[in-house]
Amino acid sequence: MNERYELNKNLAQMLKGGVIMDVTTPEQAVIAEKAGAVAVMALERVPADIRARGGVARMSDPKIIKEIKAAVSIPVMAKVRIGHFVEAQILEALGIDFIDESEVLTPADEMYHIDKWAFKIPFVCGARNLGEALRRIGEGASMIRTKGEAGTGNVVEAVRHMRIINAEIKRLTTLREDELMAAAKELQAPYDLVKYVAQHGRLPVVNFAAGGIATPADAALMMQLGADGVFVGSGIFKSQNPEKMAEAIVKAVTYYDKPEILAEVSEGLGEAMQSIDIRKLDEKDLYASRGW
């Protein structure tokens, strides 16, 4: 079990410094791969459309996932509902590369997340804070991402979540060893993971940014805040020029600390996706609060 998990963590580590893009067709997947994406997320609808349509959002049709998988050579991810281990079993049977237990889809279980140790395939999970991140890792997640607020084109929540996680990690590194058990209780997280973070000053898995990233500047901002890479959902194919936007965001993640290059890649992209002021959303319409 531990050998398999170490392999899964290493697979996620190989995506570090890259961009993972949401795609809904094989054609979009090819655009993403040509632009330099390190992986794609196969979906029936991007988060902006899921948000607009409402209702219950479920795992994508296996036919769509298989078509996207056949179109590209880079890893393909797909989403399942929180707690829906049967959807995860189906995706594992399809030979998908990573499963995202995602708050963007309608939760199937409001009490329990999936036991990710029961699967051979690596899992990605969202987190708003260090406690959530360590609980998901304790369940077997090989990769963490900020939850942000998907489908809004508004990066503010992703920034908030990344800053919170980083601040809580920094705090752990200042504690004495005899204070770590109390910290584990406070975080509601496994003691061994809390101790690891305190000793190493980082999560034991990669932590990507996700949720509301709509421009190259957004992507570079998240990288400068300490993200290991970036997920872009609606920001590519809801923009005016998806091909140019995809290439620009990949370059922005690579050269995130080079303002001259960021200025160059941000030029002439056309209009970014339509955005939403998160303050105007009802509590029931917030995805990030799903899960615990």
From Swiss-Prot:
The keyword Nucleus does not apply. InterPro entries: Aldolase_TIM, PdxS/SNZ, PdxS/SNZ_N, RibuloseP-bd_barrel. Keywords: Lyase, Pyridoxal phosphate, Schiff base. D-glyceraldehyde 3-phosphate binds at R163. HAMAP family: PdxS. Catalyzes the formation of pyridoxal 5'-phosphate from ribose 5-phosphate (RBP), glyceraldehyde 3-phosphate (G3P) and ammonia. The ammonia is provided by the PdxT subunit. Can also use ribulose 5-phosphate and dihydroxyacetone phosphate as substrates, resulting from enzyme-catalyzed isomerization of RBP and G3P, respectively. In the presence of PdxT, forms a dodecamer of heterodimers. This is Pyridoxal 5'-phosphate synthase subunit PdxS. It comes from Thermoanaerobacter sp. (strain X514).
